[in-house]
């Protein structure tokens, strides 16, 4: 939807990662090479003439953080990322997340290993905790009651129905609590510290 706002045509999901990969290949050269170089974009409509940057990054290159769930995104993350946000391919329910996340994480790490790299994973669950489960659910209800309805609908429309693979398996109706629509759609942990642990 955002691309339409700027009058752009939607670019195919996998091609977007290929284009980003080309950009980061060039950035790695800019960060690491000591001689100027020229480059004509193959997938992107840009060129670099006698390019260089100074000063160079102090630690080789800035860390790159991505979020992905698709094969094309996983390949991009394996080649370029240092930290990868992952969502549960099984949806927001903790049982399905615990069942599907280990293989999903192993896939990403193994792909990075094939490129001679290591990546770290970050899972961002929704945690709503209070002294008792009843208090936690009441607090989650309060969050839900205070959410902006139009923004939440737009978020759900743009993510649940998009071509973003990370949201596959997540629907507005399968969330344990609708608080996910207010503060995200990842794994939901709602309860007392004892029940969450």
Locate the predicted segments by residue.
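Solvent-exposed polar/charged
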Residues: 29, 78-79
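Short, acidic/polar
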Residues: 67-76, 191-197
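Short active-site oxyanion
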Residues: 61-63
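Glycine-enriched alpha-helix->loop->beta-strand junction motifs that scaffold or abut catalytic
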Residues: 79-85
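An alpha-helical appendage that flanks or caps ligand/catalytic pockets
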Residues: 6-9, 13-57, 88, 94-197
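Short, solvent-exposed loop/turn and secondary-structure capping segments
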Residues: 4-6, 76
């Amino acid at each position: 939807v955002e691309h339409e706002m700027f009058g752009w045509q939607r670019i195919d999901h996998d091609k977007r990662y290929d284009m980003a990969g080309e950009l980061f290949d060039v950035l790695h050269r800019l960060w690491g090479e000591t001689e100027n170089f020229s480059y004509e974009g193959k997938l992107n409509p840009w060129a670099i003439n006698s390019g260089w940057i100074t000063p160079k990054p102090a630690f080789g290159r800035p860390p790159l953080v991505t979020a992905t769930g698709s094969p094309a995104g996983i390949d991009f993350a394996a080649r370029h990322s240092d930290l990868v946000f992952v969502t549960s391919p099984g949806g927001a329910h903790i049982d399905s997340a615990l069942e599907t996340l280990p293989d999903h994480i192993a896939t990403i790490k193994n792909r990075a290993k094939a490129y001679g790299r290591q990546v770290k994973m970050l899972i961002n669950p929704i945690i709503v905790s209070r002294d008792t489960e009843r208090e936690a659910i009441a607090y989650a209800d309060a969050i839900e009651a205070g959410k902006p309805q139009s923004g939440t609908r737009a978020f759900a429309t743009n993510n649940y129905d998009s071509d973003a693979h990370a949201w596959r398996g997540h629907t507005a109706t399968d969330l344990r609590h609708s608080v996910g629509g207010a503060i995200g759609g990842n794994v939901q942990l709602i309860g007392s510290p004892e029940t969450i642990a």
